[in-house]
Each structure stands twice: as C-alpha cells, then as structure tokens.
Regions:
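Catalytic core of the metallo-beta-lactamase
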Residues: 4, 11-21, 127-192, 209, ...
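Structural motif
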Residues: 23-25, 62-63, 88, 136, ...
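Metallo-beta-lactamase
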Residues: 1-3, 90-167, 250-271
Length: 271
C-alpha cells in the first residue's frame, strides 16, 4: 500500500517531501527566509519563520505537486526558481499555462524558462512511472480557497496511489475550506493518509471569512476518512494564519482524535 511505503518529511508551510517508489515529490515549494514581506495590489503577506532546510539542501526533486502558483505562501521566489530543475510541475490548468509561458504573477517577475508544467483538471488522472517499475497515479481534486462566490483563482488538491490499487491512497487537500468538493473526494476514494492544509488563513480584504480550513473543519475531514492518518500542513509560519499547533492539539484532543494525528518529521539533509 502506498501509505505504508511513502516517507513524508516536513519543510514548512505547505511544503513537504514525499519519497515513494524511488521518486522524490515536493508539495508547494516555499523556501524564502523569515521576515519576507510580499506586497500585492490587494494585500501583504508576512513570513514569520524560515523553512526547515533551504532549497539548495533538498537535493534532486523529480516532480512538484503545486496546489496553485499565484499565492506566495504556496510558491515563493526561491520555490519558483527550482521549478525548471524538476521533470514536471503538476498544478492547475491555469497555473500550468502561466508557468509554461513565463507569465508573471501580479507584482512579481516572470517564471524562469524551462519549466515543464502539466495542468490537471478536477478528477483527471496522470500516470508517472516510478523508479522501481510501478506506475504512480495522480488525480486532481477540487478546492475552494475561501467563501463561496469569491475569485481567488483556481486551486487543486491531489490523490496519489499506485495503478490498479484503490485502497489507502494519499490525499493532499491543497488550500481549501470544507465544502462539497472535499466531501466528494470522500465518496470517490479510499484514503489512508491526508496531508491536510489547515491554518484558518485570513486577510482583511476578505473580511472575517477564512481562506483555508479551520481546525474544526479539519476534524470533519478526519471523520470523513475514518481510518486515515492526519498529517497537518499549512499551520504555522505566516502572519495571516489564525490557527496553529496549539489549536490543533486542543481541538483534536477534545474530539477524541488525537491518536489520528501524525506530525511529519522535519527533513534533514544527507551528509
């Protein structure tokens, strides 16, 4: 089973290293140092903590699973610069077009040349050969990055499994709130591990609504996938995150689900 074989390492924010079948996959690369301010016409993001390792310490990456390219807490400047060194960047269809065409984000410089980005629509699946002779399937899953009706750009999640296997897949939620799209993932897939983006991100321009899952919503995900291990991501390191480690521990304890949590160990570079 893929969940028994996969090794997950935490790097920071929504950045995690997944080692499976000889492949090294990286989610939402963010490697800029602490203290960075990212100013757009609509808002400013403030990064508070550094990544566990810097981009040059991570080693070779085969593929990047990028939930979206247009927010700097999911793809920052240093993360952008490593994208042309990987075999493919799997992301939204809109994001793939921007990256392949070197289109700049608002207030940012263009993407580097040489990126091979693949757009993945909701429920579409691509196949990637592993280095041990198997086939890894990656399926796009829906996300809603905040309250209904807002235009915050497309975001995708992912379900990973080996071809011909249907049990105990890995679900990477991406930046989403709890809504019917997440529930549909539960109807379509048997999941054994959830990399769950939490943080209850909030920005003044949006008002009191949250842009990513609250801890309370994440508990709904844990109950939806009743036997899955829950690995939190996207819960620390930014000023606009309103919930973090303490809230996760408190609410999961109150819900009787503390034993479902597994904190991914930080990645340590090989000597």
């Amino acid at each position: 089973m893929i969940t028994q074989e996969a090794k997950i390492y935490y790097i920071g924010t929504a950045t995690a290293l997944i080692e499976i079948g000889g492949l090294r996959l990286l989610t939402d690369p963010a490697f800029d140092p602490a203290g960075m301010l990212y100013t757009t016409p609509a808002y400013t993001l403030h990064k508070l903590t550094p990544p566990k390792v810097m981009a040059e310490q991570i080693g070779h990456i085969d593929h990047v699973l990028l939930s979206h390219d247009h927010h700097l807490d999911n793809l920052d400047h240093a993360g952008m610069q490593l994208l042309n060194a990987v075999d493919s960047v799997i992301t939204t269809t809109a994001g793939a077009e921007r990256l392949n065409n070197q289109s700049p984000r608002p207030g940012d410089t263009p993407a580097p040349a040489g990126i091979h980005a693949v757009g993945l629509a909701n429920w579409a699946t691509i196949e990637i050969p592993t280095k041990d002779g198997r086939i890894l399937t990656i399926t796009g899953t829906p996300c809603r990055h905040g309250p209904a009706g807002g235009d915050r750009g497309p975001v995708t999640g992912f379900v990973l499994n080996f071809k011909e296997e249907t049990k105990d897949g890995i679900y990477i939620t991406g930046d989403t709130v709890w809504y019917e799209g997440v529930e549909e993932v539960g109807r379509r897939f048997d999941i054994g591990l959830v990399l769950l983006f939490i943080g209850a991100a909030r920005l003044a321009i949006v008002g009191p609504d949250h842009l990513t899952m609250t801890v309370e919503e994440s508990i709904k995900v844990a109950r939806l996938f009743g036997h899955a291990v829950i690995t939190p991501l996207h819960f620390e390191g930014w000023e606009h995150f309103s919930q973090g480690y303490d809230e996760i521990i408190r609410e999961y304890t109150a819900a009787g689900l503390l034993d479902r949590l597994h904190w991914a160990p930080p990645y340590t570079p090989e000597k």
